[in-house]
Amino acid sequence: MPGYGMMWFGEDSSGSNLEWNGFRAWTELPEDVIVVSAQLTDWHETSVRQAIELTEYFIENFSVDKSRVYAAGYSAGGETMSQAISMRPDLYAAYLHGASQWDGAYEPIAQNDVAVYIFMAENDEYYGSAKARSAYDGLQAAYREKGYTDKQIGELLILEIPNNEYFNSRDIYNYHSGGNIVFDDETVLNWILSKSKTQEIQ
């Protein structure tokens, strides 16, 4: 789910999300995947429910492995998707939360073993990295409340907060928009794709 700049603002904005790397990156992996990218009309309950309905539509009408359905959200899209996976954690095996704040609940994620990868620049200009740490702490606490060990939590929850040097060495100096670089990292994408609803947490 893309951010504000690729939301739906009328016909002139149609398809602006299709060149977004957060969409294209998944199609360039060796594994066959169905990739769906929606354009938000807001980042509140309307788009949350639309995201869930879109997921359900593809599950019901296409050849989808229901144990391997994933979500990704960047910026405003992350605000929406964190709510969507919290509302329907039974649908998703893993979620990539990029450069965003967490607007959903934590407990439903832990109760349904949804794996979450959180990526935020240390000096993100819009949200600040404290938002990412807060989300990580909330999810970690929810998994501990469930009785999981640190090792088990490590299988399900990762926080990555790169410093300025990480971005500057890649000629990136706007750290919020630079958060899109997470979609260039096949290690992260493959971590998401490695998760399954049928996977036993060791």
Where are these regions (language model features)?
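Active-site machinery of serine-nucleophile hydrolases
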Residues: 1-52
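Active-site nucleophile loop of the alpha/beta-hydrolase fold
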Residues: 40, 96-104, 123
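Short glycine-enriched nucleophile-adjacent loop
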Residues: 78-89, 95
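C-terminal catalytic histidine-bearing segment of alpha/beta-hydrolase fold enzymes
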Residues: 119, 125, 144-202
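Short alpha-helix in the alpha/beta-hydrolase fold that links the catalytic acid
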Residues: 127-145
